[in-house]
Amino acid sequence: MENFTFQEKIKYQIQKNKKDNNKITEVKIFNEKFVEMNESNFKIIYNEREMGLKSSLEISNDITSNIVEIELKQINQITNLSNMFNECKRLYSFPGLSKLNIDNVTNLSSLFRNCINIRKLPDISKWNTSNVNNMSYLFSGCNCLFSIK
């Protein structure tokens, strides 16, 4: 599993741990919990230190429709966040988003695109966007979003 991408690790662990009528409660990779499930709803937990990701993060399209919460931890070296939450139509919660260090990020395009259940975001006013050169479609399709700090 060492050479697997993050999404391949999640898919592998989900398939490996299927039990109790296909109801998975969590997925652990390297003893770190990355996915929690409640019936058909996912909570994704990103931790760069454990995943070893250095340039971009991606969520597989076959699980985005069920993600309701994403928790971000220790993601400091990522440079490309484009499309990270794109099409997460049930997503409404982002614990840790305000603490996300995006100092090295150059691309935020379509980050929250079509996240139609987001109503407000945590305070992102302290984000350092000085290196970002692409923010196109950042909030495109977020029709319920009424508050950005």
Show which residues each predicted segment covers.
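Negatively charged
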Residues: 1-149
